[in-house]
Amino acid sequence: MSDMAYLQQFRDGNVTVLELSSKCRLLEEMLLDAVGQELMQAAQAALPPIVVIDLSRTEFFGSGFIEVLFRVWNRIQQKEGGRLALCALQPYCREVLEITHLDKLWPLYETRADAVAALNKS
């Protein structure tokens, strides 16, 4: 396990799990640079490049965080076999991703265990 200011990092089989901390309950603009930097750093270091972002503590994010997710996803996709999934989303956050059809790009899982099992299996 590795701790940063805004996220904790875990390994589960071949999957790197990035769990946003309670400081990220409301992912507003003033946090995005720091959170984005930590996510990018962790995504870059993930080997193999299979990452689950656990958003269980996040109740709100806007378009700025979606842009961060795109940057993280692009970084992961640069490596062979790169995959990104999101898990444990609060209803509002899940709805945002479904309305924008980003759930087609990034698989959404109800629980961290479901996400890790799916990515370890494939």
PLM regions: where:
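Short acidic-hydrophobic, aromatic-tinged amphipathic segments that line or gate anion-handling sites
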Residues: 106-112
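Receiver (REC) domain switch/output surface
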Residues: 119-122
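Amphipathic alpha-helical interaction surfaces in cytosolic regulatory modules
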Residues: 26-106
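STAS-typified acidic loop motif
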Residues: 2-37
